Amino acid sequence: MGSTRFPNKTMKLVSAGIPMIEAVLLRLSQSKKVDQVILATSTELNNQPLVDYVDKLGYDVFQGSERNVLDRYYQAALQYNPDAVVRITGDCPLIDPNIVDAAVRMYEENDVDYVSNTNPPTYPDGLDVEVFSFSALKIAWIEAKTEYDREHVTPFIRNVEKFKTENMINSADC
């Protein structure tokens, strides 16, 4: 909610007349490969309307650090104990559950730590998905030292010298 370029963007109404975050959560709920959808947001007071809204919708909410998003994800994962984490940002109301499922399948079928469709990006903006193991997240949480790595969650995990990664490539570069 604290975006400097577009404040409160996740609570802005989208074409369906619902807040953007609700559209994202509804679409993610259509995934056949995602067992649980959790909003991981910060403890900043300006996020309370978002937290209350998502809680009222019946989704789990985890609150953590505003700046250290890697820590927020790690602490959420500790609480919910997933085998893998699927990361979708809250400003992607057109996220396609079929693309999410394809990324999870790629993760499950290959012996990898990290799968995404963003390295290089061949899908349209707004369809970004990342899937990574809890163990890779834990290593990143322990070893990542730069502010950039801690603020952006996955740059450390995308290190191909340390982790096995795969990129999901769209058949037509959009």
Name what the model sees in each region:
Residues 1-41, 45-48:
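N-terminal glycine-rich phosphate-binding loop and ensuing alpha1 helix
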Residues 5, 94, 131:
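Short aromatic/basic micro-patch
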Residues 42, 65, 90-92:
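Short acidic donor-binding/metal-coordinating loop in glycosyltransferase active sites
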Residues 55-67:
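Conserved donor nucleotide-binding strand/loop of the catalytic core
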Residues 68-75:
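Glycine-rich, basic loop-to-helix element that forms the pyrophosphate-binding segment
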Residues 75, 80, 92, 96-122:
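Conserved donor-nucleotide/metal-binding helix-loop-beta segment in metal-dependent transferases, i.e.
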Residues 85-86:
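Short aromatic/hydrophobic "clamp" motif used to bind/position activated sugar donors
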Residues 132-174:
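Active-site oxyanion/phosphate-handling segment shared across diverse enzymes
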